[in-house]
Swiss-Prot record:
Name of the protein this chain belongs to: Exodeoxyribonuclease 7 small subunit
Domain of life: Bacteria
Lineage: Bacteria, Bacillati, Bacillota, Bacilli, Lactobacillales
SUPFAM superfamilies: XseB-like
GO biological process terms, semicolon-separated: DNA catabolic process
Enzyme class: hydrolase
A GO CC annotation given for this chain: exodeoxyribonuclease VII complex
Keywords: Cytoplasm, Exonuclease, Hydrolase, Nuclease
Organism: Enterococcus faecalis (strain ATCC 700802 / V583)
Places the protein is found: Cytoplasm
InterPro entries linked to this entry: Exonuc_VII_S, Exonuc_VII_ssu_sf
EC number from the UniProt entry: 3.1.11.6
Catalytic activity: Exonucleolytic cleavage in either 5'- to 3'- or 3'- to 5'-direction to yield nucleoside 5'-phosphates
Length: 76
């Protein structure tokens, strides 16, 4: 049975914990690399979730003939 995918909030919290651990600088190299890899996967999952939410909102607003404008992030 596949593992349950984390919610956006769970993923974001896990990502924040990884960042804090790596910023301390006391993590062995192998562990740091594994944590970084996990952080990148969590970051992608969060980004995908946000993009899906934006598309859903855009569709809902379009169906109601309401204008919606999302500003592009400079980080993208």
């Amino acid at each position: 049975m596949p593992a349950k995918e984390k919610t956006f909030e769970e993923s974001l919290n896990a990502l924040e914990e990884i960042v804090q651990r790596l910023e301390r600088g006391d993590v062995p190299l192998e562990e740091a690399l594994a944590a970084f890899q996990e952080g990148m996967a969590l970051s992608k999952q969060c980004q995908d979730t946000l993009e899906k939410a934006e598309k859903t909102l855009t569709k809902m607003m379009t169906e109601n003939n309401e204008e919606i404008v999302f500003e592009e992030s400079e980080e993208a």
